[in-house]
Amino acid sequence: MSQSVLRLVDKDTMDKQKALEAAVGQIERAFGKGSIMKLGQRGSVVDIESISTGSLGLDIALGIGGLPRGRIVEIYGPESSGKTTLALHVVAEAQKKGGQCAFVDAEHAFDPLYARKLGVSLDDLLVSQPDTGEQALEIADTLVRSGAIDVLVIDSVAALVPKAELEGDMGDSHVGLQARLMSQALRKLTGTVSRSNTLIIFINQIRMKIGVMFGNPETTTGGNALKFYASVRLDIRRIGAVKDKEEVVGNQTRVKVVKNKVAPPFKVVEFDIMYGEGISKLGEMLDLGVKANIIEKSGAWFSYNSTRIGQGRENAKQFLRDNPAMAEEIENAVRANAGLIAEEMIGGPGGEDDDAGGAAGVGDEA
């Protein structure tokens, strides 16, 4: 198909502004109106929409109130660190706002009962369990192109097995096959994701690089492409246990914003993930309230506006659970002090988990 060729403009007869207008007009005739424009002409480019993560602290750490729409996000971490839980919370928050969500379960490990406990509406959730990596990414591409999906979760990159690997024998070597598959898929997806305003969340696993003597040996699967295309990368880790007397009832979790293209990165936030409940919003509210001097902590006692909430964290959480009006008041006060809290979350680029997701080595294909 023949395309218009830009013509040279005589500088003597037309100034630079007219030359620019002529060039823009020619581009629009060739590729359609809106193919080129000044940034100020489209307010949506400047104002980035977001979807809450279900964690008050993480929303503040991300700088825009949640994960950005129309972008690619990567959540990675060790096993049982809360990657899928965090992704399902995003799905639940999107559904609360009337959004349509899809879950591509490449690991074939989706637990609908747990998802329902986190607040996910199973009746409105599209779920696919593809056989191959190519099939999973093709399904993702089709859903994004429809323009009807608000959040799409792919769990996980490590489980996107190329067809050639599935059809081959167990001992066959397929070096770089998954990395090439991811690179090709992301090249196709990135433009469509932006136009459809869909949030794509890739969940990823951690592997160890072979022969690393200095620095962090951790890396993520699927090659380097996802690291470049992702606007936000979250490193999630389990750092301890939450106990009720002697019984372990949850995990203490730390999330580091390793990469952020829409706000300053390197913020670190900690929250509890309770078994059968998910992210503990009330526990997070207490911690952030103390940090912002909204809640006073004296010894084991928590107080708000001279009212004692409870002795010990679990008792204080139960008090807020029984008094939703006070909990909402504290949440609003915390959100009003988001800027102050965000400044205290800065962890810096250095740390034990920096290089996780570095260049994938040959050993990572295993």
Curated annotation (Swiss-Prot):
PROSITE patterns: RECA_1 (PS00321), RECA_2 (PS50162), RECA_3 (PS50163). The keyword DNA damage applies. Residues 346-366 are annotated as: Disordered. GO terms for biological process: DNA recombination; DNA repair; SOS response. Keywords: ATP-binding, Cytoplasm, DNA damage, DNA recombination, DNA repair, DNA-binding, Nucleotide-binding, SOS response. It is found in: Cytoplasm. GO terms for molecular function: ATP binding; ATP hydrolysis activity; ATP-dependent DNA damage sensor activity; damaged DNA binding; single-stranded DNA binding. GO terms for cellular component: cytosol. Pfam families: RecA, RecA_C. ATP binds at G77, P78, E79, S80, S81, G82, K83, T84. Belongs to the RecA family. Can catalyze the hydrolysis of ATP in the presence of single-stranded DNA, the ATP-dependent uptake of single-stranded DNA by duplex DNA, and the ATP-dependent hybridization of homologous single-stranded DNAs. It interacts with LexA causing its activation and leading to its autocatalytic cleavage. This is Protein RecA. It comes from Rhodospirillum rubrum (strain ATCC 11170 / ATH 1.1.1 / DSM 467 / LMG 4362 / NCIMB 8255 / S1). The gene is recA.
